[in-house]
Amino acid sequence: EQQIDKKHIDIQGLDVGKVMVQGDKSLLHQVIYSVFVRCHTPEGTFHALERDLDRIRALGTDILWLMPIHPIGIEGRKGTLGSPYAIRDYRAVNPEYGTREDFLHLVGAIHARGMKCIIDVVYNHTSPDSVLAHDHPEFFLRDEQGRPARKVADWWDIVDLDYSVPALWTYQIDTLKQWAAIVDGFRCDVASSVPIEFWERARREVETVRPGCIWLAESVHGAYIREMRRMGAACSTDTDLYRAFDMTYDYDLWPCYEAVLKGKTPLCQFTDLLTYQELTYPTGYVKARCVEN
């Protein structure tokens, strides 16, 4: 069995490349509309969301991004309903939203209106009581006492996955391929904390199921990258992420953007940074421009 060095996350024999993907520049002109199913309608269901699709399309929406649609963990849950980013089962839909058939019908309705559908992929971590934690405890990061661990202390409702385990790669990619048979792409949560080599392999394999699959990375603030690296954890920069993703977040400009809005920084500094992006990122890069996450 091929092994992954746990200390350095140096990938051996996994046939990963080191080149940037040729991104789809048409994404520059497309509008992504984010929906949290629980809060979008009074009912908080897939079926109820369907009734709003015509309005969403009329806004000029090209891509509908559904925040996590999966069952939420109970152990360590934040609040009564829990965070959708503490996922219990990657391969199921949250029964509070409806059935799998309801989800399939929703995606069909999205497509019928000329929009694409992408779903959230939360592959850095799961809930402590997840299916994977029960069936594959070897997939998880451990502390010195052998207990499931996490790198970000105040994310107390999750435990981190350990991508030095080759079998985890296979499970996760198989899951992506299952969803790629239904949806048009993925918004990948805290993508920087999952090895870029994993995302490269995932993209190649998903392409066999969904040619032209959309890949949006939630890249991270510079402060997060510094902290992860200080801890000895791998963390990809935006430039790294373009080896596998079509789009990254605009976090690299957000401190300046917020300062401009507050009148603390002249607009010219922000436009200078936009130019710097053109000089820094690979040809064909796309940034997801947004006012907040």
Regions found by a protein language model. Give the residues of each.
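Catalytic cores of glycan-processing enzymes that make or break glycosidic bonds
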Residues: K6-H8, R210, Y285, R289-N293
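Non-catalytic surface loops within mature trypsin-like serine protease
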Residues: G23, V37-C39, H221, P255
